[in-house]
Amino acid sequence: MKIGLISHDGKKASMVAFVMKRLDFFNREDVDIVTTGTTGTMILHAGVEKVQRVSSGPLGGDAEIGAMVARKEMDAIIFFRDPLDKHPHEPDIQMLMRLCDVHDVPLATNYKAGHIVIEYLSKK
């Protein structure tokens, strides 16, 4: 299964904590992780063994992951958004969220929702 992990700058520490708490899941043989740039670097340092990194969000990474959703290559997206900050690539973020809805791909935008998605996926 393929899971997208994305986090805004203000949520990167939360994403790292989230991943570290679930390293056994994220390092499973059947789990592939796709991340945006800096998030991927931080997750690798947190102990995830294999990560496919795309561009950073503002440079098109959210759109790249959105394209994977549209091609039905993603099983879930965990996107820790910072709703209190402005993002120049907001149209890409909205497009990614819309594509998840269109293609029925689970999308978690906070820690607790992410936990629920991982619990669901771990039973697949």
Locations of regions flagged by a protein language model:
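Ser/Thr/Gly-rich flexible loops in soluble cytosolic domains mediating phosphotransfer, phosphorylation
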Residues: 85, 93-124
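Short hydrophobic/aromatic-enriched beta-strand-loop microsegments
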Residues: 49-60
